[in-house]
Amino acid sequence: MLNYLWFFLAALFEIFGCYAFWLWLRQGKSALWVIPALVSLTVFALLLTRVEAAYAGRAYAAYGGIYIVASIAWLGLVERVRPLGTDWLGLAFCVIGATIILLGPRWSAA
């Protein structure tokens, strides 16, 4: 269960870090936005290493579903844009895929 906490915290820090770059490069905000962006993206990377998983690739794949959930939430809550039906449909497919990866059986490679 602690993995989900790390995933959600990592998603928030990653989205904020990327959004800070977006504000600077796409919306003409101050270049000082780079500072919190870099700090946030560093914290994101550190948080993702807290996930208990045998392989980084599997952890990142499972995290992808959480990231997409957080991104759609960010779209609505921070950017005040109502998600489209296609956003919700895509989110559902991604969450199903991430759940399969996260909860799927683990066999040895022997």
From Swiss-Prot:
GO cellular component, as recorded: plasma membrane
Top-rank taxon, per record: Bacteria
Membrane topology reported for the UniProt record: Multi-pass membrane protein
Membrane-crossing residue ranges in chain numbering: 5-25, 28-48, 59-79, 84-104
UniProt keyword Oxidoreductase present: no
Pfam families: UPF0060
Keywords: Cell inner membrane, Cell membrane, Membrane, Transmembrane, Transmembrane helix
Protein name per Swiss-Prot or TrEMBL: UPF0060 membrane protein Psyr_3752
Species annotation: Pseudomonas syringae pv. syringae (strain B728a)
